[in-house]
């Protein structure tokens, strides 16, 4: 069985490079396909196609919210565009 969300992530054309994803602990972890470094973590919110977007904080050494005032929740397509264009997700690649 192939996960439709993983397929959508892996088919996304990211200008920074190809992504691959794996399902873990109620969410998805996205990696840079070239380096294998983690890029982002997405947790599904509710029953809809909306995700809480997290980045790896080198300071906190854990996944952290991207928004200045809390969580950033976006539909999958908007989330992928957001990840592709924000530098905070690419510090470890």
Regions found by a protein language model. Name each.
Residues 19, 23, 49-57, 91-92:
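Broad hydrophobic/π-residue packing in well-ordered secondary structure
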Residues 21, 44, 48-49, 75, ...:
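Short linear sequence motifs
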Residues 1-34:
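Negatively charged, low-complexity tracts enriched in Asp/Glu with abundant Ser/Thr
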Residues 32-55:
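Short, conserved beta-strand/beta-arch hydrophobic-aromatic motifs that form part
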Residues 18, 28, 37, 47, ...:
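Intrinsically disordered, low-complexity regions
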Residues 1-9, 55-93:
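Mixed-charge, Lys/Arg-enriched low-complexity segments
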Residues 17, 40, 44, 87:
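Functionally constrained cores in energy, signaling, and assembly domains
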């Amino acid at each position: 069985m192939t996960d439709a969300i993983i397929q959508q992530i892996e088919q996304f054309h990211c200008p920074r490079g190809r992504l691959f994803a794996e399902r873990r602990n109620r969410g998805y972890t996205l990696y840079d396909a070239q380096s294998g470094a983690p890029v982002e973590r997405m947790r599904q919110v509710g029953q809809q196609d909306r995700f809480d977007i997290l980045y790896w904080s080198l300071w906190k050494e854990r996944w952290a919210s991207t928004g200045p005032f809390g969580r950033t929740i976006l539909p999958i397509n908007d989330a992928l565009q957001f990840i592709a264009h924000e530098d905070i997700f690419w510090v470890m690649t």
